Amino acid sequence: MLPRRLLLVGEGNFSFAASLIDGLDPSVSVTATGFQHRAALEGDPVALENLKRLRERGVEVRFGVDCTQLSHALPADDRDFDRIYFNFPHCGRKAGVAKNRELLAKFFQSCADVLAKAGEVHVTLCRGQGGTPADKPQREWHNSWQVVAMAALGGFILSDVCPFSCEAVPGYKCTGYRSQDRPFHIEGALTYIFTQSLPFESCQPRTFRVRLEDRWFYFTEPEALPGKLNRRFLEASSCHPIRTINEKLIAELGKTFPLKRLKCPLPLLSRGGPSVFLPATCDLLPTFWIRLHEDNSCSEFQNGEITQEMEEIPVSVSECTLPESPVRDGCKGAQEGICGRVKLGLRPSLLVHVEAVIHSPDFLPASLHVLSGPVFRKCHILPFMMPAFHETLFILGFDNNMKESCLPSLLGHLKDALGNLLTQTLQEGSSLGTSVEFVLQPNGKDYIIHVKSLNFGPDCAENLIIGSILTSKIVKHKHQCFVFVSINLDLLVMLAYGISDWRILWTFDNRFLKRFAPGKIEHFKSYSLYPPCYVHDVSFWVDEKKAFDELEFHTVARAVSQDTVVSVQYRDRFQHPETRQVSLCYRLTYQTCDKALTPQLAAAMQSQFRKEIQRQLHVSPR
C-alpha cells in the first residue's frame, strides 16, 4: 500500500522536501520539519526558494522541531505517519560516533510515538556509518553508528537497505556537514528502512486444558517451548510454508503409491501410553514432561466461559488414562495424589505411533500411510537443532517376497521428490545447489537422509540430517516387512526456501506469511536484516555430588531467553588447586530473527539466567 502521510525531519535547506513532492501523488500529505527556526534561514536564498515551493504545494512546514521529541512538536491528532525520512543525521561540528549513536537512539524512540503501526522509518547514512554488512567496505562495529542496535532501542528492526540515489530527488542539496554550509560525502550512501517489531511478551507461559476421562486438567506450556504448542501449521486452513512443502512432498509420492492419510494423534503421551523409545535405537529421547493440575472451574467451562489465556486440547481416554482413585468426592488430598501420578510427555517423534498404525484393522499393505504432526524434544542450542519441529512419517507395509522391488522403488521416488523440492528456488545457471544422499547405517539396513546445501554459505555447507529411513524389523510381524520414512519438515522448508534461521518459522509476525504465495516455493526474503548480537559469559562452580547436565543448561538458556540465545560455547574448565572444586565457563550469544533485541534486555536475560541455573542446576556462580 502506498504511503499517504509523510514526515520529513532534520531538513536543512528543505531541498529534499521540495524535490520529493514533485514525484508524489497530490493526495499524499507531507509535513516537512527542520531543527532551525525560521529566522535562521533568512540569509539562505536556496532555502527560501524551497520554502516558497512547499507553500505553493500546500506542504505543512514546521520549524524548531527536535527529532528526538517528535511527540512534543506534533499534536496528538496529527500523527500516525506512514513514513518518516531522516537524511544524513549528525549532531553537528566534530561530534564523535558515541554522540551520533545517541542521536539515532533518541530519534528512533521518538518515532515510535508518531509512526503508524505498519509505517516505515527511512534513515540515510554516509558510507560505512551504519556498521552493517551492506556497507562496502564495512566499518568495525565499535567505530560505526550501530544503526540497527540504535533502532532496536525504539522497537524497530531493519527490513531493507538500498543505495541512496540523488537522481530520484533532483535538486536535493544536502548541507550541514560539521554544522557548515558544506555537503556530506554521499557517494556510497545507503538508505536504511526500518519497521516496527513485535514486542517481547511477558515470560508468562500459556495455559492449556485437557480432558482425561470425565475430568478436566490444565498444564502450562514448557518455558523452553514459548509459542510452540497448538500452532496448527499443518491444518487445511493454513498457508504456512510447512504445510506447502508437506503437501507437495506427499503429492509427489502419491503419483507412485496409493496414499492413505491418517489423522495425527495429539502430541501428549503418558508414561503408561505409547513408548517414547525410538524403535530403531531404543534410545530414550530427551522428552519435555509436564504435570497436570486439576481444573476446578469445570462448571464455568461447561457454560462456554473459557478464559482467553486458556487453550483447549481434548485428549481421548485411550491416549492417557487416570490412575484408579478410591476417593472421587473432590477431596483435595486425593486430587493432589492423582495429579502427582499423572505425568504427560510431549511426543518426541511420530515413530511412537507406528505400533498403533500397523496393527490397526484398516491398515492396507502396499499403500503409503502418511502421518504428519509436531514433535518436541530437548536439544542443544545449535543452528540446525530445534526443540520443536513438524515431522511427516511415511509407513509402507508389503509382503516379505516383495521387499526387493518395493524398497528400491520407494527410495528412488523419495530421492527424486526431495531433489525436486530443493531445487525449485535455484536460479538458472546458479552454481549453488543441494544434493540428497541416503547414507547406509552400520546395521546395513537403515539409512540417514543427508542433504548438503551451499545455499546458506560456506559456513553451513555441512551435511544436514533431514530424516531417516528405517527398514530393519523394528516391528515384529509374521508375513510383512515395513519401511518407515521420517522427514523433518522444518529443515526441508529451510533448505527449499533459503531460510537460515528455524526460529522464524514460529514467529507470530504476520509479515512472515505475507512473504509467501500460496502453494508456491519461492526464495524467502527476510524482513529483519543484520540483527545485532550480544555476548555474555557465565562462570560457576559445579556441585561435586551431582553430574553437570549440559543439556539442561542449554534448556534453561532457551527458556529464560525466549529462544534468543543462538550459541552456547564451552570456554574453559578450572579446578581450584586447594579445594579441588571445579568451575566451568560458557559464552552465550543473544540474537533475534524477528524482534528488536536491545543490549539492556539481553543483559537482563543473562542476569535471570544466572539465577535460574543456580536454582535449577544447583551450581554456584563465580
Swiss-Prot record:
Domain (FDX-ACB) ranges: 529-622
Protein's GO biological process: rRNA base methylation
Molecular function as annotated in GO: rRNA (uridine-N3-)-methyltransferase activity
Superkingdom of origin: Eukaryota
InterPro entries: BMT5-like, Fdx_antiC-bd, Fdx_antiC-bd_sf, SAM-dependent_MTases_sf
A Pfam family this chain is assigned to: BMT5-like
Covalent S-S links between cysteines: none
Name this protein carries in UniProt: Ferredoxin-fold anticodon-binding domain-containing protein 1 homolog
The organism of origin for this protein: Mus musculus
Lineage: Eukaryota, Metazoa, Chordata, Craniata, Vertebrata
